[in-house]
Amino acid sequence: MTGCASQSPEISQKVNWPTQEQQLSKLTHYQASGKLAYKDNQQRFGANLNWQTNNQNDHLLLTNFLGQTLIKLDTTPKSVTLIDYKGNEYHGTNAAELVRRLTGINLPIEQMQNWLIGLPTAADTFQLNDQGVVGYLAKQIGPQLWEMHYQEYDFSQHPALPSKMILSQGKQKITLVINEWNLK
């Protein structure tokens, strides 16, 4: 009798964390495209997600299923610009504060540059999973405890990058599914 067994790539892959961490730390230019689902006690919505990081500058674009802009956010170390779905432009110096003030949604924008790629920079605690990549991290930001659970990774990328993660704080839950990574 002959046969073959196949394993999912997530199970068969294992990385060396110090090497993975070093490679992630060197990523200064990348783009992630996928989907975002947001849920709390008051609202729920889904959006197409496009995140770009270029050194310390970030660009977040959320669009609906028709491709219409919901939010466009550009951050630099010194300034933040948010454009809403009506085309109104807002400026500030703190991305999380500006998003919260205009949408009512709390997001740890400043930490997402690293957390999105599975780098636990500035996290209070983190744990590696069986594949040797970050499976969980947590960070206290003011009175809020933010937790990121990494569900799946794309091991075809080098370094391996998250493809599904859940960010939560209290009753807020944000599911991120990354369909495409572009490392520049």
What are these regions (language model features)?
Residues 2-21:
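Bacterial Sec signal peptide processing site at the extreme N-terminus
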Residues 23-59, 63-64, 70:
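Post-signal-peptide N-terminal segment of Sec-exported extracytoplasmic proteins
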Residues 33, 52, 72-74, 79, ...:
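Beta-strand-dominated lipid-handling architectures at cellular/organellar boundaries
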Residues 42, 66, 85-87, 141-145, ...:
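Glycine-centered tight beta-turn/hairpin loop motif at sheet-sheet or coil-to-beta transitions
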Residues 86-140, 144:
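Flexible, processing/modification-adjacent segments and terminal tails
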Residues 118-184:
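Gly/Pro-enriched, hydrophobic low-complexity segments
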